[in-house]
From Swiss-Prot:
Keyword annotations from UniProtKB, A to Z: Methyltransferase, S-adenosyl-L-methionine, Transferase
Keyword presence, Methyltransferase: yes
Annotated residues for binding of substrate: D133
Any one GO molecular-function label of the UniProt entry: S-adenosylmethionine-dependent methyltransferase activity
EC number of this enzyme: 2.1.1.-
Family matches, as SUPFAM superfamilies: S-adenosyl-L-methionine-dependent methyltransferases
Organism annotation: Mycolicibacterium smegmatis (strain ATCC 700084 / mc(2)155) (Mycobacterium smegmatis)
Protein name: Putative O-methyltransferase MSMEG_5073/MSMEI_4947
Any single biological process term in GO: methylation
Enzyme's top EC category: transferase
Keyword Protease: no
Lineage: Bacteria, Bacillati, Actinomycetota, Actinomycetes, Mycobacteriales
């Protein structure tokens, strides 16, 4: 029998339904082997996009566009999503979902390239929300750059902060775990940030900038 905590998380994950457009994007993600956030994570991203104003949002890891669709659903009608992915084919497929959702081309800026390089070209303190869903070993660098991009009151959200529980296993010391712990340390020790770890998906580490 699942513990009460596990039951609550399971209930939360099952409580969100997706529309046909997001469901189709999720199927395409499965087809190309691109990871996609769970519906509950997507719903939380939509809420955070709305709470932070949703005018300018950065996403690291476009995938097939599932998380992008959720982010856009919470953003302002004139908000712009800048989404970065090293795989041009993933972005081509994501564009299909954005088009099906009626998202105008002026509301998305898809940048194909290494996020480590692209993020450094984005302006300081100009974004309401930064969502990171990429290789865990790169989380520390993405956190540093992501926090730099945030305006006052903006939020950073890092997915895969739990690594299936390995991040909390004292005996685990592989490269992914080490990087995830370092990203968490950077956020925890930044006095400008108020953080929280949310047990949805593979763990979400979120923080708001003062």
């Amino acid at each position: 029998m699942a513990s009460s905590a596990e039951a609550i998380v399971t209930h939360a994950e099952r409580s969100i339904s997706e529309d046909a457009i997001v469901a189709a994007a999720r199927e395409r993600a499965d087809d190309i082997g691109a990871g996609a956030v769970t519906p509950a994570v997507g719903a939380l991203l939509s809420v955070l996009a709305r709470l932070t104003g949703g005018r300018a949002v950065v996403e690291v890891g476009t995938g097939a566009g599932v998380s992008g669709l959720w982010l856009l659903s919470g953003m302002r009608d004139d908000g712009v999503l800048t989404t970065i992915d090293v795989e041009p084919e993933h972005q081509r497929i994501a564009k299909q979902g954005f088009s099906e959702a009626g998202v105008g081309p002026g509301r998305t800026r898809l940048i194909s390239g290494r996020a480590q390089e692209v993020l450094t070209r984005l302006a300081d303190e100009s974004y309401d929300l930064v969502f990171i869903d990429a290789d865990p070993v790169d989380q520390p660098q993405f956190v540093v750059e992501g926090v730099r991009l945030l305006r006052s009151g903006g939020a950073i959200v890092v997915h895969r902060a739990a690594l299936g529980g390995r991040a909390g296993d004292a005996d685990a010391r592989d490269a992914e775990v080490t990087a995830v712990r370092e990203a968490a340390r950077l956020i925890a020790e930044d006095e400008r940030l108020t953080p929280v770890l949310i047990p949805l998906g593979d763990g979400l580490l979120a923080a708001v900038r003062d």
